Amino acid sequence: MESIHIQTTSKKYDVYVGKHVLSSLTEVVQRMKPAVSNVMIISDESVATLHLQKVKEALQIKQDVFSFVIPSGEKEKSFENFYAVHTAALENKLDRNSLIIALGGGMIGDLAGFVAATFMRGIRFVQVPTTLLAHDSAVGGKVAINHPLGKNMIGAFHQPEAVLYHTPFLDSLPEKEWRSGFAEVIKHALIGDVELYHWLKNNVTTLADLRDDKLVYVLKRAIPVKAKIVAQDETEKGVRAHLNFGHTLGHALEKESGYGNITHGDGVAIGMLFAIFLSEQMYKIDLRYKELKQWFLQYGYPSIPRHLKVDRLVNVMKQDKKANAGTIRMVLMQEYGGVHVVSISDKTVHTSLEAFQKDMVLGEEMNFE
């Protein structure tokens, strides 16, 4: 079975991508040493309705298999759900040789992964992503839950035993989720695979093109970009911060819009455009910002919401995990495939963000006409 190999300081594992990888789930579980004592599948209501039974049927093992389904929505990564899953794990007598399977998108992967990282000080888990966005979050071992004051503020680094990307699970995604996930694909192309970036521009005219063999190809190109960075910096002490390209403003937009009102990918798309806009200004270079803006609008990515206040966005950006002593630090670009983290003054960010917001509104109006 063809796979993408992930090598980190703490673990080696494989990512399997394709139309039939679910049939390999039993083999993946049975290969684990020590032997798995029992299994708990964690999912949400939306995904469970569509796919939970398929996963149970694919898992042909003699050990007990339990499932725990949480309500769907933006509060999936809450402390309440985290506590509830731990309670279910204890009630079902999971132990240190148990296995958790995360069946769902990025939020389920994060929640289930953090449960695995903390239950009895750490047990094994497998990621079974069901969204395009999760091609990013399912790889690399960052797991977390949210706090009312910030996203992903309570978490750990806990690598999965394997990732099984059964692409037919993505068929049920609404268009906004395809768009959200595609933003992370674009991010990986821009920061680490320029050839993929050009391929996307030539071969993915609309989001409907991301199906079948093209989808598998895109995943097999995008995931290794992250894998290479994670291999160099598993716990985000250095170059792993490059994966936050577009996320400084993106996270601020999510928070100020109210979590759930703008998708993660839409926020990241706007954030990437701003990072390129700012990079052109700071380094006096041409990164083809206007061309990229039109390309993003072609896929339906939104402009920066007009009602959001620049002052408030800047303040939220100062709370970003990359910030240092209240100084904003962003991932900027000097060339495609070449990014780095830079400290930027509040004044520079404020001035550039005001100009960017005006330019995005103008671009939206011109595109509408």
UniProtKB/Swiss-Prot annotation:
Claim: Cell membrane is one of the keywords in the record:
no
Q: What class of enzyme is it?
A: lyase
Which EC numbers characterise this protein's activity in its record? 4.2.3.4
Binding annotation for Zn(2+): 184, 247, 264
Cited InterPro entries: Dehydroquinate_synthase, DHQ_synth_AroB, DHQ_synth_fam, DHQS/DOIS_N, DHQS_C
Q: Where in the cell is it found?
A: Cytoplasm
> How are cofactors bound according to the entry's free-text note?
Binds 1 divalent metal cation per subunit. Can use either Co(2+) or Zn(2+).
| Primary role | Catalyzes the conversion of 3-deoxy-D-arabino-heptulosonate 7-phosphate (DAHP) to dehydroquinate (DHQ).
| Matches recorded under HAMAP family | DHQ_synthase (MF_00110)
State the similarity comment.
Answer: Belongs to the sugar phosphate cyclases superfamily. Dehydroquinate synthase family.
List the protein's name: 3-dehydroquinate synthase
Quote the gene name from the UniProt entry.
Answer: aroB
